[in-house]
Amino acid sequence: MGQKERSTADTLPDLEEWKSAAGLRWWQTAVVDGSGSGNEVIEGPQNARVLKGSQARFNCTVSQGWKLIMWALSDMVVLSVRPMEPIITNDRFTSQRYDQGGNFTSEMIIHNVEPSDSGNIRCSLQNSRLHGSAYLTVQVMGELFIPSVNLVVAENEPCEVTCLPSHWTRLPDISWELGLLVSHSSYYFVPEPSDLQSAVSILALTPQSNGTLTCVATWKSLKARKSATVNLTVIRCPQDTGGGINIPGVLSSLPSLGFSLPTWGKVGLGLAGTMLLTPTCTLTIRCCCCRRRCCGCNCCCRCCFCCRRKRGFRIQFQKKSEKEKTNKETETESGNENSGYNSDEQKTTDTASLPPKSCESSDPEQRNSSCGPPHQRADQRPPRPASHPQASFNLASPEKVSNTTVV
């Protein structure tokens, strides 16, 4: 009994040695191909990040004595390489071979990669459990958009220009290239909260000349670059032109706005503008700068047709009123005389009331004293209205008084 136990204890170290030897033999079998020759994967492929539409390259280095190298994409064999020639099943997957220091290097090239090609890349030997693997990432460059292709701004006036990168696999670095003179410029980047693959870059500047603005999106790791350019036109603010139209300024700004006129068209347009402005300015000066007003309206009496008509009607009405007034006075004086009035007495009265025509004295002083100031005639007084009653008196002869009728 004790001897049996002793023999069991003595055999335990032999069991451990057997396990170690079995593990070593299993590892050696793993790196041996079907023909029994030993080989291994010395260096497997490396991770790669490429752009959509470009090429992806992977290298796998194995020891001498290999029989078959298999390349798999997402656990699907896409390329097989034999010592003499590759076995190509898809034209998008090709192979290159190199000998380096007694080892063999196989290179797999994936042409025109697509986002669906992203996944695990594996290089393995036939009947071998050891392999090398890597991961392929395909990046997609999205759109780069500036809302306006041609911008027109005022000189020395601040403005903002936006650039929109959208549908990128990951957001790029945004920068601006200025092809014009500016007094100030700055930009900032604002990601879109609702879309992690989109963002907005805003450029604030104060332009001083015409030029271009370029929004640049880059992936430094891939050395990829995409840009969008916009033309910026600066318009000089006119000085004080009195509210007129600056025809030369308008013509000079047409090419920058995308319009082009021949020489004869520019000359004709300038002449047409001048011919249009000349009568406009003339009418403005005559009608707006005249200080005289008439008829209670706010227009010039010399150039307004309606005021001319009203003025003519007023003059005709005034002449007609004066004529009627004179006729009424004449009729009133003739109708107010008494029928018993003697014409001889009237003649005597008229003769007696006349002033002397000349001075008969030869002495100048006496002549001057006798020649007093001329008598004012009674008919030089301003006429009275025809509506008031009138009375005529004969003051020539105090002895004879004519009867007078008061109307």
Swiss-Prot record:
- Comp. bias (Basic and acidic residues): 320-331
Q: Which gene encodes it?
A: IGSF5
TM ranges are: 267-285
Name the principal localization, coarsely classed: membrane
List locations, semicolon-separated.
Apical cell membrane; Cell junction, Tight junction
Q: Which cysteines are joined by disulfide bonds?
A: 60-123, 163-215
Could you mention a single GO BP entry for this protein?
cell-cell adhesion
Specify where the region named Disordered lies, as residue ranges: 320-407
In which organism is this protein found?
Answer: Homo sapiens (Human)
Signal sequence, renumbered to the chain:
none
Q: What keywords are annotated for this sequence in UniProt?
A: Cell junction, Cell membrane, Disulfide bond, Glycoprotein, Immunoglobulin domain, Membrane, Repeat, Tight junction, Transmembrane, Transmembrane helix
Membrane topology recorded in Swiss-Prot or TrEMBL? Single-pass type I membrane protein
**UniProt family annotation:** Belongs to the immunoglobulin superfamily.
Q: What else is known?
A: A protein of the expected size has been detected by antibody binding and Western blot in at least one of the analyzed tissues or cells.
UniProt domain Ig-like V-type: residue ranges? 39-139, 142-231
Q: Which residues are glycosylated?
A: 59, 103, 210, 231
Q: Which InterPro entries match?
A: Ig-like_dom, Ig-like_dom_sf, Ig-like_fold, Ig_I-set, Ig_sub
PANTHER family from the xrefs? Answer: IMMUNOGLOBULIN SUPERFAMILY MEMBER 5
What residue spans carry the Polar residues bias annotation?
389-407
One Gene Ontology cellular component? bicellular tight junction
This protein's assembly is summarised as:
Interacts with MAGI1 at tight junctions, forms a tripartite complex with NPHS1. Interacts with LNX1 isoform 2 via its PDZ 2 domain, it may also interact with other isoforms containing this domain.
Identify the residue ranges that face the Extracellular compartment according to the record.
Answer: 1-266
> Which residue ranges are assigned to the Cytoplasmic compartment in the record's topology?
286-407
Describe the function of this protein: Provides, together with MAGI1, an adhesion machinery at tight junctions, which may regulate the permeability of kidney glomerulus and small intestinal epithelial cells. Mediates calcium-independent homophilic cell adhesion. In testis, it may function as a cell adhesion molecule rather than a tight-junction protein. It may participate in the adhesion between spermatogonia-spermatogonia, spermatogonia-Sertoli cells, and Sertoli cells-Sertoli cells.
Full protein name: Immunoglobulin superfamily member 5
